[in-house]
Amino acid sequence: EWLVVLAGWLLLSWLLPLLLIDLDYLWLPEPLCRVGLLLGLGMTAIIGFQQGEAVGRALLFHHLLAAGVALVGFEGVSALAERLIGKPALGLGDAKLAALLGAWLGLTGLGITVVLAVFGGAVVGSIGRLSGRLGRHQPFPFGPFLAAGGAAVWLWGHDFWLPLLGLVGPTP
């Protein structure tokens, strides 16, 4: 459907500058995250309500819930890390980007995105540390991993990622 293709182009076009800004400046601009979240909810509503009012309401609720879970979850992890190790483990921009992705991808898509982002960040961080390019306490951005994970989930879908990540068994 053309509307889903348009939504995909919009999402990917929105994630690219966020990825690049975070890589360069370790910063995710809140206005870009906020507008991206609203665009995600708007596209979700348009696509959902085209399938009927009940579907539209359910889909919009699901994606709103995912955005809220992302925001609270990421801010909670950051606050817990600050309490345990004396500094936040994530920037608040990461929480806002995760909320944006929840608005676009829903709970399942958000979960897959986070798994991909954590794995990607761990691999790149480990390589950076082992190669000496990343210092022991040197921060590096997590936003690009979230953005790339979200893009991968949008492009290949849940059915591709869930079995690959071992989160569900093969379909009979």
Question: Can you say where each PLM-predicted feature lies in the sequence?
Answer:
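Transmembrane helix-loop-helix
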Residues: 1-7
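Transmembrane alpha-helical segments of multi-pass small-molecule transport proteins
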Residues: 7-13
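Functional transmembrane core segments of multi-pass inner-membrane proteins
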Residues: 13-120, 163-171
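Hydrophobic transmembrane alpha-helices of multi-pass small-molecule transporters
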Residues: 44, 98, 122-129, 150
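Membrane-embedded alpha-helical segments of multi-pass transporters/permeases
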Residues: 45, 75, 126-130, 154-158
